């Protein structure tokens, strides 16, 4: 009887010791959730690689965040390795602002960016996920299932940490476990001192190229697409296309659009950006705001058409 009692006491002590150890040594994923709730600022830099229109794009990313008096401030700067085009997106008390080289002013959006979708360079996007944790030889891997409109072919992701719990790599995968996107983390700091003036977008920055003439944009390099009608209205140009799909483009010069644009999502392009509002998908590039209308096109197909827009001269046959 005494032996049984001793064993019971040992088991209780063992279970209690394990519980106490876990309580004093929380898992990495629990630490990240706590950090997400308590951090007041961060600085993050890295290199983003992804396949875009059958070409590998490499983008240098600088991402900063600050919380002050209950207000969240975000700053993201993207620079394309190939074109050296720079785009900046800022969230402050006034709203969301996008500035892209080639435009002489920032654009303001009514948007919940960046909280409305996953961003591999926004720490709150990563730290808030429901992870499973796996220990490896040189650190840990955190895995999570994600379903995002921004990355429709992505089904899951992994975040690699070294043995000191320093984040090194964020990878997104499709259902065939093929890597779709990766973000190599170069540096990041939690709770650094950041000047709030950083989150005020300066529209007086030097612009690399200014348009001297606004020309219509046409979807180039698309197979089985034919322009069937072109109508000039007082403020806009309406272009109707037929082919494998029917769609209409409405193009409006930038000086004719509202100063504040409502958007649920913003996608930065090499030479402009795309935004979504109430199922409408629009593109701002080359001095034009173009909205696409179609009943049988998927979101990805609309994006593909808008990213193919270029200035051209249409010659009637």
Language model regions located:
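One face of beta-strands
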Residues: 42-48, 59-65, 70-78, 87, ...
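Short, solvent-exposed recognition patches
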Residues: 202-286, 294
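An acidic-aromatic
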Residues: 65-118, 174-184, 274, 283
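Flexible, processing/modification-adjacent segments and terminal tails
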Residues: 20-28, 90-155, 194, 206
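N-terminal leader/targeting segments and the immediate start of mature chains
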Residues: 2-72, 130, 134-135, 265, ...
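Short beta-strand segments that buttress and anchor functional surface loops
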Residues: 46-50, 74-81, 142-149, 170-173, ...
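Gly/Pro-enriched, hydrophobic low-complexity segments
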Residues: 77, 137-205
């Amino acid at each position: 009887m005494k032996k049984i009692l001793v064993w019971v006491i040992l088991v209780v002590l063992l279970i209690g010791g394990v519980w106490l150890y876990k309580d004093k040594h929380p898992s990495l994923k629990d630490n990240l959730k706590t950090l997400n709730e308590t951090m007041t600022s961060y600085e993050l830099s890295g290199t983003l690689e992804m396949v875009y229109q059958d070409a590998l794009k490499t983008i240098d990313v600088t991402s900063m965040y600050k919380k002050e008096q209950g207000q969240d401030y975000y700053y993201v700067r993207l620079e394309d390795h190939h074109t050296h085009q720079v785009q900046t997106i800022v969230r402050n008390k006034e709203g969301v602002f996008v500035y892209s080289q080639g435009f002489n002013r920032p654009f303001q959006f009514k948007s919940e960016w960046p909280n409305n979708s996953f961003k591999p360079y926004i720490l709150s996007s990563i730290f808030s996920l429901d992870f499973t944790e796996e220990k490896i030889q040189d650190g840990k891997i955190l895995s999570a299932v994600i379903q995002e409109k921004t990355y429709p072919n992505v089904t899951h992701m992994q975040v690699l940490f070294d043995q000191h719990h320093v984040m090194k790599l964020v990878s997104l995968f499709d259902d065939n476990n093929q890597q779709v996107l990766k973000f190599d983390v170069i540096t990041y700091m939690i709770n650094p001192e950041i000047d709030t003036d950083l989150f005020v977008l300066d529209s007086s920055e030097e612009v690399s190229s200014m348009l001297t003439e606004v020309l219509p944009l046409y979807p180039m390099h698309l197979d089985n697409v034919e322009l069937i009608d072109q109508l000039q209205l007082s403020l806009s140009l309406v272009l109707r296309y037929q082919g494998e799909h029917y769609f209409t483009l409405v193009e409006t010069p930038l000086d004719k659009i509202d100063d504040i644009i409502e958007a649920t999502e913003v996608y930065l392009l090499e030479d402009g950006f795309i935004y979504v509002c109430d199922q409408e998908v629009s593109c701002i590039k080359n001095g034009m705001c173009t909205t696409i209308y179609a009943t049988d096109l998927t979101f990805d197909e609309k994006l593909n058409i808008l990213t193919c827009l270029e200035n051209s001269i249409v010659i009637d046959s």
